[in-house]
């Protein structure tokens, strides 16, 4: 018998994994991975654990509201940096000179549009800024490995017909 889950997907008993402790390679490449119910859940869990130097986050101007929500709920002040029409970050000086305690960046639609930030992320980390990469859009991209951020988050359910799924690494 099938059960309705999330009012969007049907799943039968024979489609469930039982006693599977092995992490798929597309997730294990991120190192220590914690599975969550969603990308938003991964971000919320992370924000409960970290203590930034100041509760201000720097976010790309083109971003899903579900990424913004955990920061708002945790009491962060939100600041945005611009991306151009190709979704490449453009406010490099704003990012460099920001006093934010947390910096979130991402590639879009399978492309490493945030690649330009690689060196800057290392600089921010050396200044005790917590850096987070959201790899939801680039999870299966063969373009590049993630930037060396402190944390990686992602939503798995954007890629599969499943009702929930996210991760924190």
Predicted features and spans:
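Conserved PLP-binding active-site segment in aminotransferase class I/II-type PLP enzymes
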Residues: 1-53
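Conserved PLP-anchoring active-site segment centered on the Schiff-base-forming lysine
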Residues: 46-95
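A short beta-strand submotif of the Rossmann-like class I SAM-dependent methyltransferase core
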Residues: 35, 59, 105
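Gly/Ser/Thr-rich loops at beta-strand to alpha-helix junctions
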Residues: 40-41, 63-65, 110
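Short, aromatic/basic amphipathic alpha-helical patches
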Residues: 19-27, 67-75, 117-124
């Amino acid at each position: 018998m099938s059960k309705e889950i999330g009012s969007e997907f049907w799943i039968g008993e024979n489609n469930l994994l039982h006693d599977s402790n092995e992490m798929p390679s597309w997730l294990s490449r991120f190192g220590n991975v914690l599975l969550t119910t969603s990308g938003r859940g991964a971000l919320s869990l992370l924000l409960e654990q970290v203590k930034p130097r100041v509760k201000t986050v720097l976010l790309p101007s083109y971003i899903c509201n579900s990424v913004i929500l955990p920061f708002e709920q945790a009491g962060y002040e939100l600041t945005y940096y611009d991306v151009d029409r190709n979704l490449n970050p453009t406010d490099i000086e704003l990012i460099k000179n920001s006093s934010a305690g947390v910096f979130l960046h991402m590639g879009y639609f399978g492309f490493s549009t945030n690649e330009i930030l690689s060196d800057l992320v290392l600089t921010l980390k050396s200044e005790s800024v917590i850096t987070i990469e959201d790899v939801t859009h680039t999870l299966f991209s063969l373009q590049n490995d993630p930037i060396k951020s402190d944390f990686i988050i992602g939503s798995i359910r954007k890629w599969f017909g499943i009702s929930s799924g996210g991760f924190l690494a």
